[in-house]
């Protein structure tokens, strides 16, 4: 596990160390929040994962429509959401465009040869995205924080919004 305080500098480090959620080098959930599976419930999930066979992958490509035509004009509705795969959604809210958890890599992994693979490609190239007002990164798992995608988007100058601990990676 990465010590967020060690990776942080300046004001971010001060805020990390002062956070009531930060202790012993890691951020902790508030009392009562118990992430993960309940005791005794993991056996079936693990068995399905290891022996699931064809049930683990779609039998054919999922239907997909290019979002490019819709993005060429601003939305009239108060909200439009375009799902781009797993955790990545382009939200259009009151004229602003916010991209959540941009993942464009083929695998959710720190290396390109291992880790869970996409069922199908992202429906649009990263450089074909419209101008963005903000990027929201919810947390630092590989299926939500794709380093290559974030670096490419950061070069556009779009603000990246995330929590204190995740900001240390950026």
Each language-model region and where it sits:
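Short, polar loop motifs at secondary-structure junctions
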Residues: 163-169
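Glycine/Thr-rich phosphate-binding loops of Rossmann-like dinucleotide-binding domains
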Residues: 108, 145, 170
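A generic "binding-loop/recognition-motif" signal
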Residues: 87, 141, 166
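Active-site metal-binding motif and surrounding structural segment of the metallo-beta-lactamase
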Residues: 113-162
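Metallo-beta-lactamase
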Residues: 1-128
